Amino acid sequence: MSEIEVFDAEQLAGLIEGLAEAIGRDHPHLQKLTLIGIRTRGVPLAYRLRDRIATLLGIPPQVGELDITFFRDDLSAGGLRTPDRSEMPRDLTGQEVVLVDDVIFRGRTVRAALEALNHFGRPERVRLAVLIDRGHRQFPIQPDYCGCQLSTEPEQTVRVHLRETDAEERVLLIDKTAKIKS
């Protein structure tokens, strides 16, 4: 197994800044904007985006937290985890929602998130913001806002480390098939 640091803390902060600027540019009137972080790492990213957008535009958008455990179609592959509670700041009917996640790969997480959102109202529009797009989609789902497109192989893993969840800041590319020569 090999690990390569793709982004360090400073570069990661730059990606988040770029996402915040793009979202802020598209939503100058924040009254209808709700950022919704997909658990786990999408939640701290949503709060960071809120803080940056508030700095840029003077008003913080609303933030929600979405747990998709029971909406996944791949529960048997990774085992059942204990679900968390979804928390929404308001009814999403008529709102402009930006779903936030750390990495998009096959599109299954986002598909589940879209299904879970139906329980919180009918948004006017739903967009997707991701830190890393690594390709290899199985569903026709594409991010509207993307920090970086990273070329990967399907057997590789992209792992985002955030201080809120991992006590450090970086992005790793992990290749489980690589052999270390001795």
Swiss-Prot record:
The keyword Glycosyltransferase applies. The keyword Transcription regulation applies. It catalyses: UMP + diphosphate = 5-phospho-alpha-D-ribose 1-diphosphate + uracil. Pfam families: Pribosyltran. Gene3D superfamilies: 3.40.50.2020. GO terms for biological process: regulation of DNA-templated transcription. A motif (PRPP-binding) lies at residues 97-109. InterPro entries: PRibTrfase_dom, PRTase-like, PyrR, PyrR_bifunctional. Its EC number is 2.4.2.9. SUPFAM superfamilies: PRTase-like. Signal peptide: none annotated. GO terms for molecular function: uracil phosphoribosyltransferase activity. Keywords: Glycosyltransferase, Transcription, Transcription regulation, Transferase. Regulates the transcription of the pyrimidine nucleotide (pyr) operon in response to exogenous pyrimidines. Belongs to the purine/pyrimidine phosphoribosyltransferase family. PyrR subfamily. This is Bifunctional protein PyrR. It comes from Synechococcus sp. (strain JA-2-3B'a(2-13)).
